[in-house]
């Protein structure tokens, strides 16, 4: 079973957590090590269109996933980011939260991470030549999946 993520079909091998309403996946082109995505299962383009139960699940699970990736990737902080609409930089028409574990000095200026996220999915820079291999992504997902199997 594949997961729908806007115009993309996501293989189960790169999904490391699924709840009744949300799923978490590794990123094919991470801005920092451990950069993952959290999405509602229902393909909804804008945050305002999520139901209250979807919002609650999305953010409760985002909190759990953030805690795990911060620990696993030896971060000291986390950046959570959501681009909601084209003028906000959204390129995938499916609500999603970027979860990025952070470390001191990972960017020259702290806010440079937002510049990196802005160009992260631009069409001219989003080609398979820039993506990680399916094997690498599946291996990372397998490691992260273990944190949630209790």
From Swiss-Prot:
Post-translational modification comment from the UniProt entry: Phosphorylation at Tyr-114 by SRC is required for induction of apoptosis.
GO CC term (a single one): mitochondrion
GO function terms (MF aspect): adenosine 5'-monophosphoramidase activity; adenylylsulfatase activity; adenylylsulfate-ammonia adenylyltransferase activity; bis(5'-adenosyl)-triphosphatase activity; identical protein binding; nickel cation binding; nucleotide binding; ubiquitin protein ligase binding
Main location: cytoplasm
Function summary: Possesses dinucleoside triphosphate hydrolase activity. Cleaves P(1)-P(3)-bis(5'-adenosyl) triphosphate (Ap3A) to yield AMP and ADP. Can also hydrolyze P(1)-P(4)-bis(5'-adenosyl) tetraphosphate (Ap4A), but has extremely low activity with ATP. Exhibits adenylylsulfatase activity, hydrolyzing adenosine 5'-phosphosulfate to yield AMP and sulfate. Exhibits adenosine 5'-monophosphoramidase activity, hydrolyzing purine nucleotide phosphoramidates with a single phosphate group such as adenosine 5'monophosphoramidate (AMP-NH2) to yield AMP and NH2.
Quaternary state and interactors: Homodimer. Interacts with UBE2I. Interacts with MDM2. Interacts with CTNNB1. Identified in a complex with CTNNB1 and LEF1.
InterPro entries: Dinucleoside_ppp_hydrolase (IPR052677), FHIT (IPR039383), Histidine_triad_CS (IPR019808), HIT-like (IPR011146), HIT-like_sf (IPR036265)
Site residues, Important for induction of apoptosis: 114
Name of the featured protein: Bis(5'-adenosyl)-triphosphatase
UniProt-annotated binding residues for substrate: 8, 27, 83, 89-92, 98
């Amino acid at each position: 079973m594949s997961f729908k993520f806007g115009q993309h079909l996501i293989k189960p091998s790169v999904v490391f957590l699924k709840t009744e309403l949300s799923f978490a996946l590794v990123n094919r082109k991470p801005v920092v090590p451990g950069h993952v995505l959290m999405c509602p299962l229902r393909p909804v383009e804008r945050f305002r269109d999520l139901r209250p139960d979807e919002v609650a699940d999305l953010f409760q699970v985002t909190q759990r996933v953030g805690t795990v990736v911060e620990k696993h990737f030896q971060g000291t902080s986390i950046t959570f980011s959501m681009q909601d609409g084209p003028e906000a930089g959204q390129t995938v028409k499916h609500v999603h939260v970027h979860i990025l574990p952070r470390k001191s000095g990972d960017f020259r200026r702290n806010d440079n991470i937002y510049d990196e996220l802005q160009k992260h999915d631009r069409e001219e820079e989003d080609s398979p030549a820039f993506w990680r291999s399916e094997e690498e992504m599946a291996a990372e997902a397998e490691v992260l999946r273990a944190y949630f199997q209790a």
